[in-house]
């Protein structure tokens, strides 16, 4: 890809010229279980671009997408890029009031929504003064809700338009990031960022190949999922298995058996659940996975080691962000050190700084800053937040890390999750990692809580494995003391049914502090 061209030329149109038109690009594992070849994607995305033109869409107008993982997602995303418009994929798990806020904030002129999501989305569209059309992706010919247009009718008889010219530095798409606090921010990315992540993590770490079959637990609308399931496989002409449902362990096992993915992209909570289920079943799983990736939260050492024993392949754990589009700090295949986030991905640089922006020494905790080719242009309508996050070439992540003597980076927690006990920093993640190594514990979250003297101490919330009884509190406290130190052990152990999480599986510790 020429860094000064529309990303759709490289990721879609190029495959026709290189003879991959008949190869399957996307295969649905649920719903209608359809397939979409590279050739058909090129045609249908060009037709969607034509439909946008027909509806008066101009360059850089936003096309909001509340679309589950299904064939139409890549058609709409790449079709919008071909037309010079800006696709804005939204989390499909949000509430109506959040959708309303985002639709108003983005000023989207066209909304494309899956029919299964319409009842939640409908209130968000009422009274919207920016939308010119609401397009519902319907699975049959039974009709669509009043005031909307079916996807089939929207694109019917539309001409297949040629991909518009665009510079690599032109805005291409937005992703709304809520982080762990739930306040949506529009993160603006340019055309060249997609190939930048494919060339760095996709090619040089993951080693994505044309003969790979990829399955990503993270959905398309996440930055992590967009790379895993779309830009990485499409950069080499591979095939992606898409699943719009909830990725339960049983669903994951079914996909492994039926669709035989070679690359599996998950998140720590899902890996933990799948490992626990396989251990419950006994034996080894049926699979064809050559490599797995994890992001969203730091992967606990215990989970990585148990997975590798069962699956016989590594989980390459790393850290990325919506602002950087994908993973920029990662372990490497054949060199995975569980409990660390590895080393900078080729093409990226990182720093650890203190509260005065001075570099910290080896073993000291500092905030992680990153710079590289996929950094966002900033937030939409969030000038102050943009200025405090994007500082010149460097992007603040809000993550606290320390560096080992071997140069590897160890996650300590979010800036607002860290706390001091007796004047010493405590990493919630370190305590949580010790807790889940205690027999019977599936998940754990640690937050600060004042004791009777109003001194801050660690408090733990734990989820037990199915069929396991609550642990003896003193036994688990003693276990953690022995593993990581006297001042770090949790003074309170609360057993809960589940932990609050974001849609990406990140633990929302702020809800436990409230």
Please give the residue ranges for each predicted region.
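AMP-binding/adenylate-forming catalytic core of the ANL superfamily
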Residues: 94, 111-113, 257, 264, ...
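Conserved pre-ATP/AMP-binding loop-to-beta segment of ANL
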Residues: 22-24, 136, 157-176, 183, ...
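Conserved AMP-binding/adenylation subdomain of ANL enzymes
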Residues: 195-216, 221-262, 277-278
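ANL superfamily adenylate-forming
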Residues: 30, 34, 116-168, 278
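Gly/Ser/Thr-rich phosphate-binding loop
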Residues: 261-266, 276-337, 349
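Conserved helix-loop-beta element of the AMP-binding
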Residues: 107-109, 126-138, 212-215, 241, ...
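Conserved AMP-binding/adenylate-forming core of the ANL superfamily
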Residues: 22-70, 74-78, 95-100, 152-153
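Conserved AMP-binding A3 loop
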Residues: 35-39, 165, 172-196
């Amino acid at each position: 890809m020429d860094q000064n061209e529309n990303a759709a030329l490289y990721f879609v149109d190029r495959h026709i010229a290189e003879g991959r038109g008949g190869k399957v690009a996307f295969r649905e594992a649920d719903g209608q279980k359809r397939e979409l070849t590279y050739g058909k994607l090129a045609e249908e995305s060009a037709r969607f671009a034509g439909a946008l033109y027909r509806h008066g869409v101009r360059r850089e107008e936003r096309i909001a997408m509340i679309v589950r993982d299904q064939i139409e997602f890549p058609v709409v995303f790449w079709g919008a890029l071909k037309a010079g418009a800006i696709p804005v994929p939204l989390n499909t798990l949000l509430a109506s009031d959040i959708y309303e806020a985002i639709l108003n904030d983005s000023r989207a002129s066209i909304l494309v929504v899956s029919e299964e999501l319409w009842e939640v989305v409908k209130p968000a569209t009422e009274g919207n003064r920016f939308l010119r059309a609401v397009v519902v992706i319907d699975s049959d010919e039974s009709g669509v809700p009043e005031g909307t247009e079916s996807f089939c009718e929207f694109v019917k008889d539309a001409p297949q338009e040629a991909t518009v010219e665009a510079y690599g530095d032109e805005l291409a798409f937005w992703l709304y990031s809520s982080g762990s606090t739930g306040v949506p921010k529009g993160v603006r990315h340019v055309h060249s960022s997609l190939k930048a992540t494919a060339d760095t993590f996709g090619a040089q770490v993951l080693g994505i190949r044309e003969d790979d079959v990829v399955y990503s637990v993270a959905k398309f609308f996440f930055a992590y999922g967009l790379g895993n399931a779309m830009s990485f496989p499409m950069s080499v002409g591979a095939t992606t298995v898409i699943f719009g449902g909830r990725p339960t362990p049983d669903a994951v096992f079914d996909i492994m058996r039926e669709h035989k993915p070679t690359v599996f992209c998950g998140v720590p909570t899902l890996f933990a659940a799948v490992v626990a289920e396989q251990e419950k079943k006994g034996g080894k799983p049926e699979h064809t996975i050559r490599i797995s990736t994890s992001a969203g939260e730091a992967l606990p050492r215990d989970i990585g080691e148990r997975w590798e024993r069962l699956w016989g392949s590594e989980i390459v754990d790393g850290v990325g962000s919506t602002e950087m589009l994908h993973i920029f700090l990662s372990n490497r295949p054949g060199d995975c050190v569980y409990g660390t986030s590895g080393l900078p991905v080729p093409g990226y640089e990182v720093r650890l700084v203190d509260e005065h922006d001075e570099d910290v020494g080896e073993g000291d905790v500092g905030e992680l800053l990153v710079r590289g080719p996929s950094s966002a242009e900033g937030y939409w309508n969030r000038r102050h937040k943009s200025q405090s996050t994007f500082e010149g070439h460097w992007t603040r992540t809000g993550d606290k890390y320390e560096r080992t003597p071997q140069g590897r980076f160890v996650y300590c927690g979010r800036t607002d999750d860290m706390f001091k006990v007796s004047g010493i920093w405590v990493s919630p993640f370190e305590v949580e990692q010790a807790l889940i190594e205690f027999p019977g514990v599936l998940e754990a979250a640690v937050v600060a809580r004042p004791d009777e003297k109003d001194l801050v101490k660690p408090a733990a919330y734990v989820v037990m494995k199915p069929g396991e009884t609550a642990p003896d509190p003193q036994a688990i406290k003693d276990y953690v003391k022995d593993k990581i130190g006297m001042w770090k052990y949790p003074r309170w152990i609360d057993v809960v049914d589940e932990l609050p999480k974001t849609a990406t599986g990140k633990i929302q510790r702020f809800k436990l502090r409230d």
